[in-house]
Amino acid sequence: MEQLHMYWKNEGQTVPEYKLPEGYTVKKITEVPDGVEQWLEIISHGLVDGVRDKAFYQRVMVEEKGFDPEYCFLVMCGDEAVATLDILLYTWRNDGHLHMVGCKENHRGKGLATALNLLALKTIQELGFATASLTTDDQRIPAIKSYYKVGFQPDLSTQDYVERWAKINAIIGR
């Protein structure tokens, strides 16, 4: 099944500053000595199935159009990376695309994804992009709630999308 799409328009609105719970910080993957290894561990918690290695990181990140490691963020709890979000810079369409957003199970429900989403929108706005976009799966209800919370809107461009979003919105009471 094709992933769902969501969009955010940069209309000069104020994007709130992100706030992390006490004990958490954000670093760029380039600032963490074993950042790639820690990123691989995070994404194994619900984003991908099976063992992943540096070749996987190379394929889904480094070789991805618009990838810049300066925009790959890790939420740290001490020396442990517990959540991640990457912004792909789609300059050809004036868009910042949220990519590989994930969090370890034992750190979910603490607002880390919302903080990362706000950081991404603020960054995208500061870079001057007109829009932000993302793709997600129907069953990722907590993630979808977080995307709605920061202002993303669903793509309703096809009847299939309309029907799928109606089911999701019924589940979350929207």
Residue ranges: model-predicted function:
Residues 134-144, 160-166:
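Conserved beta-strand-loop-alpha-helix junction that forms the acyl-donor binding cleft
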Residues 44-103:
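A conserved beta-strand-loop-helix scaffold within acyl/acetyltransferase catalytic domains
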Residues 148-157:
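Conserved acetyl-CoA-binding loop of GNAT-fold acetyltransferases
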Residues 25-39:
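A short beta-loop-alpha structural element at the N-terminal edge
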Residues 7, 13-17, 89, 96, ...:
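Long, contiguous binding/interaction regions
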